[in-house]
């Protein structure tokens, strides 16, 4: 979903769950739900793998 894409991009940028919740004006639980779904769908096991995926898909860049 577009919301999952937003969460993925913010995770890849190094934002914390709390920061993401604040930016998207949702609860921390909602952010955790999206992160869990993304990781399950992509068969990823860590935030590092999530970041690597986001970079490879062009959702974020390394500064």
Locate the predicted segments by residue:
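Recognition helix of helix-turn-helix DNA-binding domains
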Residues: 16-49
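The N-cap/first-turn positions of alpha helices
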Residues: 3-4
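C-terminal edge and immediately downstream basic/flexible tail or linker adjoining helix-turn-helix-like DNA-binding
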Residues: 55-63
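Hydrophobic residues on short alpha-helical segments
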Residues: 8-12, 39, 51
